[in-house]
Amino acid sequence: MAENHVALLLTPEGWKLLSSLPPYDPSEALSLGRSLREEGHSPALVAAALTQQRLRERAAAKFGPFAQQMLFTADGLEQATRLTVSAHHAARYAAAGVTKVADLGCGIGGDAVALAGLDLPVLAVDRDEAAAALATINLMPFPHASVECADALEIDLVERGVDAVFADPARRAEGRRITDPEQWSPALSQVLALRETVPALGVKVAPGIDHAALPADAHTQWVSVDGDVVEAAIWCGPLAPEGPGRSALILRSGAQGTTACTLVDPSTTDPSQPPIQLDPI
């Protein structure tokens, strides 16, 4: 959804209209749009509201019932961390006893929501105005969370009282996936350098990242959700109680909710070394 469509929804009329819509039903979308225009709403506002209604329906797979109170863009939703995964991220910060987390490259605020949901004060930062606006809306239920539209690397973390960081560098440009970590925005090396100021650092990275790009003194964990490998994350300092190495977090959905198990690679304490390839039997 274009930025001007997001702006339309942030007006009193736009928010009221969006809040009045029923759950998305593709068989009713055309007739609903026609009815809303006949009521006097502008075509642009109707299009924005119906697009958001459809995005919320898609977002339920990642955010469950919380999606109905959030705002999304198509790109933001695609890149957002699933709530089941971000909850595990947030648990690391809570267990480490940190007092304020900076979510750098927060996007629509998915990870910041999980952190704030554990009563952790959060400073969410994104340089994209539309993303920052959506994160502001999505974090409204949490008075201990704030959002800034700024370059993540220009934030003075010490001055802001931040003692932990979660970073999600942009890994796409013009719709194309970027595989070189030094071409991410910001570059992986720039993000890892934040450890000199804030040792408690977590970085979301692509699951297919070259092992040579992983810091040898950190713990890297790959995450699988219902059989799909969705991400990897680098955990540093107090956020890595396992110590240097690598592991896999496996999440499975079922009738009793989500179950989790962790598999640790016992063969190495250096995640920058590629896994041993076993000969086929």
Each model region followed by its residue ranges:
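S-adenosyl-L-methionine
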Residues: 1-99
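Short conserved loop adjoining the S-adenosyl-L-methionine
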Residues: 154-160
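Class I S-adenosyl-L-methionine
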Residues: 2-23, 166, 171-281
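Conserved SAM-binding loop
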Residues: 135-136
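Conserved SAM-binding motif I beta-strand of class I
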Residues: 121-126
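Conserved SAM-binding strand-loop segment of SAM-dependent methyltransferases
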Residues: 143-151
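Conserved SAM-binding loop of SAM-dependent methyltransferases across substrates and taxa
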Residues: 108-120
